[in-house]
């Protein structure tokens, strides 16, 4: 899901750095959208990212993070600007989960499984280079990612036109440098 989103909204450096990792299947990803008390209203988020030099410090909590305890990376929506209007002031980051200040706690389900987590952030660090798109423009990025989640790869393959423009292999070759 995050690969097509980075293709659309990421800069060239992000594409060259992140897409090969995804294409090689290195590293599991989780989604940091839902928050306690917000229900299905994703724009009611309270997790913040505050600038600190060349990085942002992330504080808050996410809930229902699928496989958060086993993921290396999270794509996350955070509040970076005013709360009103609530769809503004949201930014989209990729976040390394293996760092101090990130605590993913499995939620024990009645079935005995623990696929979902509640994830806590206490001064977790995201580099400025890990912001996808522009400051406070993350709501657009997050909505687009949800479209990829719901529609699969059709948007990548067709560019949204319904006609084939490229293949996933073509995209992987471009950013991974492999012509095989």
Question: What residues fall within each predicted segment?
Answer:
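Structural signature of FAD isoalloxazine-binding scaffolds in flavoprotein oxidoreductases
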Residues: 41-45
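Glycine-rich beta->alpha junctions and the first turn(s) of the following alpha-helix
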Residues: 102-180
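A structural signal for short hydrophobic beta-strand segments in well-ordered beta-sheet cores
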Residues: 47-50
